[in-house]
């Protein structure tokens, strides 16, 4: 058992190193040699014990970003419902702190590759569908609890919120000073405040 735990810890360490290099250098410039060197390995072949090739490493890296985001959402929304839970979900997804900024830089890099790589696209699509389902569930709770006016088109509301969150990933990368963490949180609060009045 300890050997399995060690193997998994090393895989995660390699993935986290990959995130850092992608965030600093871009996905195309983060070579297996650079990743191995940053991990303290003399040769990139050592990485093959954990990932057969760069594509497999990138896929695992994207999967772990989505997994960690989902873990934060689950922790942040535990014991909450309706608009309170929806607020926490939005705040966990947007890149508004140093950790999520790194994740966003990496995720945006993956989105470009996902246009031509089915496996990456499937991971991103699964995450979006999961978040959309959560948003719709929290909206239904908000309606039930009279936190917001009846929603004529909850699907459209869910799509609007998701596009705000995904859009903030892009605009915060292009202009981080203008689209700061506080600015992102303000935009999320504005969107949720509109729900409490009318849709």
Please name every model-derived segment.
Residues 10-19, 35, 61-65, 69, ...:
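Generic hydrophobic, amphipathic alpha-helix propensity
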Residues 60, 73-104, 154-161:
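Hydrophobic alpha-helical connector segments
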Residues 7, 11, 62, 66, ...:
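Amphipathic, non-transmembrane alpha-helical scaffold segments
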Residues 101, 121-129, 143-199:
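Hydrophobic/aromatic-rich alpha-helical bundle segments in the mid-to-C-terminal region
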Residues 1-9, 199:
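N-terminal intrinsically disordered/low-complexity leader segments
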Residues 52-56, 77, 81, 98, ...:
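Residues in soluble alpha-helical coiled-coils and helical-bundle/repeat scaffolds
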Residues 85, 98-122:
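Amphipathic alpha-helical segments used for helix-helix packing
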Residues 13, 20-56, 60:
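Helix-turn-helix
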């Amino acid at each position: 058992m300890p050997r399995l735990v060690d193997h998994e810890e090393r895989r995660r360490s390699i993935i986290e190193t990959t995130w850092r290099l992608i965030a600093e250098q871009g996905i195309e410039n983060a070579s297996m040699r650079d990743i191995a060197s940053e991990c303290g390995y003399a040769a990139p072949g050592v990485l093959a014990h954990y990932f057969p090739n760069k594509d497999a490493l990138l896929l695992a890296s994207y999967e772990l970003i989505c997994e960690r985001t989902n873990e934060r959402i689950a922790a942040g929304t535990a014991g909450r419902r309706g608009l309170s839970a929806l607020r926490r979900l939005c705040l966990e997804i947007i890149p508004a702190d140093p950790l999520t900024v790194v994740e966003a830089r990496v995720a945006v890099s993956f989105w470009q590759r996902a246009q031509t790589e089915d496996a990456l696209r499937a991971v991103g699509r699964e995450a979006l569908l999961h978040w959309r389902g959560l948003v719709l569930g929290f909206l239904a709770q908000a309606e039930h609890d009279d936190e917001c006016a009846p929603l004529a088109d909850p699907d459209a509301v869910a799509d609007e919120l998701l596009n705000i969150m995904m859009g903030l990933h892009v605009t915060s990368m292009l202009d981080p000073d203008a689209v700061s963490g506080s600015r992102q949180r303000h935009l999320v609060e504005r969107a949720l405040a509109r729900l409490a009045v009318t849709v």
